[in-house]
Each structure stands twice: as C-alpha cells, then as structure tokens.
From Swiss-Prot:
The modification Phosphotyrosine is found at Y309. InterPro entries: ADF-H (IPR002108), ADF-H/Gelsolin-like_dom_sf (IPR029006), Twinfilin (IPR028458). Actin-binding protein involved in motile and morphological processes. Inhibits actin polymerization, likely by sequestering G-actin. By capping the barbed ends of filaments, it also regulates motility. Seems to play an important role in clathrin-mediated endocytosis and distribution of endocytic organelles. It is found in: Cytoplasm; Cytoplasm, Cytoskeleton. This is Twinfilin-1. Interacts with G-actin; ADP-actin form and capping protein (CP). May also be able to interact with TWF2 and phosphoinositides, PI(4,5)P2. When bound to PI(4,5)P2, it is down-regulated. Interacts with ACTG1. Residues 316-350 are annotated as: Disordered. It holds the Pfam family Cofilin_ADF.
Length: 350
C-alpha cells in the first residue's frame, strides 16, 4: 500500500490507465522500477478475450521477476470494461521483490480503479494464471473444492512468503482455530473499508456452507453503531471510527466481535470464537489493515461514544509508580553489623 512503500503511479501511467479503462488496450504489464510504477507492455485486442489470453499473458511472465498484469475481458459492468488482475510472483524471485510487490498491490488497484477489476489471481507458476488456471479459479469460486495436502502446503507457502494471497479456498486448521474461507464479496468490502471507501462492514458465518460472508455495508455513524449489533446472532464488525484526540483528527479501524450470550447455539458460539483469530490474521496480514482496537461485546448498548473513545485511547495513570523497595528475607534477621569509619577504628585500637 502507498503508505508502506510510497510507490505510486505517475501522470503518464494514469493516462494509460484511463485509455485502457475506455477499451483501447487488452493487456497492460506493470512493473516497479526505481520506486515507481511503470508500464512494461501494452497490447491491443486482436480477437476475443479467451483467444487472446494465453498468447498475450504467458510470454510476459519472467521466471525470476514479479510483475502485475491487467487483462481486459469483453464484458462490462456499470463502470465500464471488466478486468482480471494478476499478481505474478515466481518462486525463484528475490524475497525482497516479492514483499515489495505484495505491499504495492493495493496501491496499483486503487490507481487503476478497483471497480473495474472483476477477478484477481495470484501465481507462482504459469499454470496458475493460464487460461486453464483462470477457468479453474472461476470454478472454485462457484463451488469450492477441498485442497489436496500438496495444494494446501503450497497455499500456505504463498501466504507466508508473499503475504498477498487471501484465503478463498477451503477451510483449514490453524493453531488459533478454524480458518473458514472468506467470500470474494466480503473480501472486496474489507478492501474498500481499508481504502476508506466504506465506513462499516459486517460479516457473518454461513454455518451450513462453512464460509465467512458479507452481511451488510450500511453507512454507519457512531450514534448508529449500537443498532447494527444483532440481538439474536453473532457477528464480526469492522468500523471506521472517525474522531478527534488531543487536537488531531483520526480515522481508526475498530474490530468488534458481538456474541449475544446464550441466545446462540453452542455450535455457533464455538465457530465464531474459533474463526475470529484466523480471520483477523488474514485481514491484518494480507490486506495490511491496521486495526487499532479489538473489542468483544454482548450487546450493542455497550457501544457508547465514551466507551469506544476510552477503548481506543485508554486513560494513562496520572502519577508514575515509584520503585518499591525490596522486602528483606522473612523470619529472623542475622546479627546487626556496624561498619566503622577509619577514625573510629583507630580510636578503638588505641
């Protein structure tokens, strides 16, 4: 992200992005050079998107160099043509390069326009992002299939090394609990919140299908926040807390886990509790979301303005505690010793 790497698109790159969004180009390859986003290659359409795909995309992917690829589909949404965003990070590239491209990924998407991006893919080998790989990706979105042990291991390696691929596959066990997959819609909403395009995201667990899905993204002011907390079901909430502190205007993301006591089933309580830590790990690591405070509540009535302010800015002790003198050993003390000065010693000798 821009606040992490400082890498942004120049005006020339933004102009090319604008022409691409209008349909002039089928493909853009973007690289990072001298701490700037640069266009490495542009291709105009020559056939339908699926006929162009492999011949356009695969030759541009280098074995030891990460890059981004934006590939235009023939379909359109309300904002214009839809695009596939490919984050290419080959296994043999340097770790520093992988981390740099991972940290700049959100910036590029924001500069291009996230509303134009229909699908996102991440790949370490060309098969991952080939036309066949894209079709497998679409199939997995409609009906997720369990990963094999080898696929699961590879996915974990990608997450640990690159910190950019979000779990949208199948559930897996972690040391902290059960990591259910996050729906694409929920992930996109969290990304918009992180980019300050939304101020509230509520997630719920689809227990039957074992997936975390989007509940709502209603625009929410602080006074409305208690109304967003269900009284009969658990939820995860991400709230953009806008406030002033010591003269500074702040926008802080707060995570709220609401569990209305025993009105929920035991299974629901266990699942929400087990999925909480893995969800936060994905959001903080993969989206680089800075969550300033994590709160657990029973009902929305607790979410007053004073409560939230004190949670985000805990009161400091007015006085520093003085160092406590160590206590002597318990029980009887030994014989008291008197240390004489030199003058006293000489007088005694005489």
């Amino acid at each position: 992200m821009s606040h992490q790497t400082g890498i942004q698109a120049s005006e020339d790159v933004k102009d090319i992005f604008a022409r691409a969004r209008n349909g002039k180009y089928r493909l853009l390859k973007i690289s990072i050079e001298n701490e700037k986003l640069v266009i490495g290659s542009c291709r105009k359409p020559s056939d339908s998107w699926d006929q162009d795909y492999d011949s356009f995309v695969l030759p541009l992917l280098e074995d030891k160099q990460p890059c981004y690829v934006l590939f235009r589909l023939d379909s359109q949404n309300a904002q214009g043509y839809e695009w596939i965003f490919i984050a290419w990070s080959p296994d043999h590239s340097h770790v520093r390069q992988k981390m740099l491209y991972a940290a700049t990924r959100a910036t590029l998407k924001k500069e291009f326009g996230g509303g134009h991006i229909k699908d996102e893919m991440f790949g370490t080998v060309k098969e991952d992002v080939s036309l066949h790989g894209y079709k497998k990706y679409l199939l997995s979105q409609s009906s997720p299939a369990p990963l094999t042990a080898a696929e699961e291991e590879l996915r974990q390696i990608k997450i640990n090394e690159v910190q950019t691929d979000v779990s949208v596959d199948a559930k897996h066990q972690t040391l902290q609990g059960v990591a259910f997959p996050i729906s694409q819609e929920a992930f996109q909403a969290l990304e918009k919140l992180n980019n300050r395009q939304l101020n509230y995201v509520q997630l719920e667990i689809d227990i039957k299908n074992e997936i975390i899905i989007l509940a709502n993204t209603i625009n929410t002011e602080l006074k409305d926040l208690p109304k967003r907390i269900p009284k009969d079901a658990a939820r995860y909430h991400f709230f953009l807390y806008k406030h002033s502190h010591e003269g500074d205007y702040l926008e802080s993301i707060v995570f709220i886990y609401s569990m209305p006591g025993y009105t929920c089933s035991i299974r629901e309580r266990m699942l929400y509790s087990s999925c909480k830590s893995p969800l936060l790990e994905i959001v903080e690591r993969q989206l680089q979301m800075d969550i300033i405070r994590k709160i657990e509540i029973d009902n929305g009535d607790e979410l007053t303005a004073d409560f939230l302010y004190e949670e985000v800015h805990p009161k400091q002790h007015a006085h520093k505690q003085s160092f406590a003198k160590p206590k002597g050993p318990s029980g009887k003390r030994g014989i008291r010793r008197i240390i004489r000065g030199p003058a006293e010693t000489e007088a005694t000798t005489e």
